[in-house]
Design a protein with these regions (language model features):
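N-terminal glycine/serine-rich phosphate-binding loop of ATP-dependent small-molecule kinases
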Residues: 1-98, 127, 228-229, 233-241, ...
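Active-site core segments that coordinate phosphate-bearing ligands/cofactors
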Residues: 8-10, 109, 116-129, 136-139, ...
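Gly-rich Lys/Arg/Thr-decorated short loops/hinges at beta-loop-alpha junctions or inter-strand turns
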Residues: 37-47, 124-125, 175-182, 205-208, ...
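Short acidic-aromatic active-site loops that bind/stabilize oxyanions
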Residues: 46-54, 131, 213, 217, ...
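Short, conserved phosphate/pyrophosphate- and ester-handling motifs at nucleotide-, phospho-/glycolipid
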Residues: 49, 105, 245
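Short beta-strand-loop/turn "lid" adjacent to the catalytic site in phosphate-handling enzymes
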Residues: 66-103, 131-136, 167-188, 211-216
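Short, glycine/charge-rich flexible loops or terminal/linker lids adjacent to PRPP-binding catalytic cores
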Residues: 105, 220-224
């Protein structure tokens, strides 16, 4: 039974909670508890009950305690990384006024377009926040709520992000971090604070918002007696400020000021995401210029349709996902839930180039290709935001770190390798978000740099898979990219 200090990193994602129990001294993952929660909504709506997140967190921690054999007295800290952008509206008792509007809720697309123009266009927004409003940003959801459900907006005593809500349940304090705050549309990456003019623009009182901690690894407070009783953990252990899921993944992979800078990562999950940690503040309208959890920055591009969309195509075709073949002449853009990058909230899936000889396996392969090209197109923009020339020989040969559920899928890996032409590194952990959250918890409990801790854990654990580059499939790239350009131009 472990006797060394243990921390818990919670990944509260779109559909589940995971709680990773990690030895601080070694980085050894002792157990990962899991619990599901539901997402509801039809059309463009995607909502979830924040109380279900709290229930799933409790269940995941209980499972992890049981499976790891860790005595509760060994746990010294906990931190939450949550799905970004969600709008959580609370009443005076801290209970949700309504279900949370999630990151992939696209109903606020008209509000995003209106807000972009009201401030003076994309450049005005990136100059302040690093990002142009799209339907995923929290500010657009608040504007939508005020227009469509004014009573709910008027009832708000507090406005939180998903991870803020859970951190407050743990520590009893209202706190967020620069990383997750930078995905709201009302936090300025230029000033490092909430932007009063933007809050006025959307009609949001700053008094409803949490305090912004210096970093995600800052100790926000201590586990309250009520939370300790609910979780079976000691009261008084460190609770870190926590961060958003993408920022936590960067920490878990050792990206940041205390680790790797300007090295790209591709995450294949419900969404497809490409990002890198850098010291340069990103201001490109082509991507989201987020702050990172450690005081650096995280230029990031995210697509709405990745593994879940391809799984749906496989189900429609009656195929196993591993039976896919290269798409041949067919192009399938799996934009089943609209799309964020490019910004096409009303888009639907499209199938182009069918022939008599086209097989179901090729159609499925084309879905993989459509999803991968969509997210890889943003890779060059991320590298430029880091101040790099994507075509430079050293930069173009820089390995691409592949994480997320898709990194465990043979055809996902083969498709990324073929269409990127880059060497791939697949880290051993399947849970970089939870590991990153655990590193933040360790930082809060020890005072050490979370990124440095995560790097040390990686070195101790080992097991990274290295795949050399293959010749890039430029024909497929050009064919799919042209279809994306046509979709984006209307």
């Amino acid at each position: 039974m472990p006797t060394q200090a243990v921390v818990i990193g919670v990944d509260s994602s779109t559909q589940s909670a995971k709680a990773a129990f990690i030895e601080v001294a070694t980085g050894r993952v002792l157990a990962v508890g899991r619990a599901a929660h539901e997402v509801s909504g039809a059309g463009g709506a995607r909502e979830s009950d924040p109380e279900a997140w709290w229930g799933a967190l409790r269940e995941a921690v209980a499972y992890g305690l049981k499976e790891s054999g860790v005595p509760a007295s060994s746990v010294t800290g906990i931190a939450v990384a949550g799905q970004q952008h969600g709008l959580v509206v609370l009443d005076g008792s801290g209970s949700p006024v309504r279900p949370a509007m999630l990151w992939n809720d696209t109903r606020s697309a008209p509000q995003a377009a209106a807000l972009t123009g009201e401030l003076g266009g994309p450049g005005a927004w990136t100059g302040r926040t690093g990002s142009v409003p799209v339907a995923s940003l929290t500010a657009t959801k608040w504007r939508w709520l005020r227009e469509h459900e004014p009573r709910a907006a008027e009832a708000a005593a507090a406005v939180r992000l998903p991870h803020d809500f859970l951190t407050e349940r743990l520590a009893g304090v209202a706190v967020t971090d620069p990383g997750d705050a930078s995905g709201t549309g009302w936090y300025s990456t230029k000033t490092g604070a909430y932007d009063p003019e933007l809050l006025d623009l959307i009609g949001l009182d700053a008094g409803l918002l949490p305090t912004v901690a210096p970093t995600g690894g800052t100790r926000a407070g201590s586990l309250t007696a009520a939370a300790a009783d609910a979780l079976g953990l000691p009261a008084g252990i460190a609770v870190a400020a926590g961060t958003g899921d993408n920022m936590a993944a960067a920490v878990g992979l050792g990206l940041g000021g205390g680790g790797l800078l300007d090295h790209p990562v591709l995450s294949l999950g419900t969404s497809g995401t490409v990002f890198a940690a850098t010291r340069a503040r990103p201001v490109s309208p082509a991507l989201s210029g987020f702050a990172a959890a450690d005081g650096t920055y995280l230029p990031l591009a995210c697509t709405l349709n990745c593994t879940l969309a391809v799984d749906r195509i496989a189900a429609l075709l009656g195929l196993s996902r591993d039976t896919a073949e290269a798409g041949g002449e067919v192009v399938l853009l799996p934009y089943l839930d609209g799309e964020r990058t490019p910004d096409l909230p009303e888009a639907s899936g499209s199938l182009i180039g069918l022939r008599h000889t086209t097989s179901r396996q090729q159609i499925l392969g084309a879905a993989y290709e459509g999803a991968v090209v969509t997210v890889l197109r943003a890779l060059d923009e991320v590298l430029r935001a880091c101040g790099l020339d994507p075509a430079g020989p050293e930069v173009s040969a820089r390995p691409l770190r592949l994480v997320g559920g898709g990194a465990r899928g043979r055809h996902w890996v083969e498709t990324v390798r073929r269409l990127s032409g880059r060497p791939l590194l697949i880290p051993p952990t399947a849970e970089p978000v939870a590991v990153g959250a655990a590193a933040l918890a360790a930082g809060a409990s020890t005072g050490n740099d979370p990124v440095e801790l995560a790097r040390a854990w990686q070195s101790a654990v080992g097991g990274t898979v290295e795949l050399p580059p293959v010749e890039r499939d430029t024909a497929t790239w050009s064919r799919v990219s042209a279809a994306i350009d046509r979709a984006a131009s209307g």
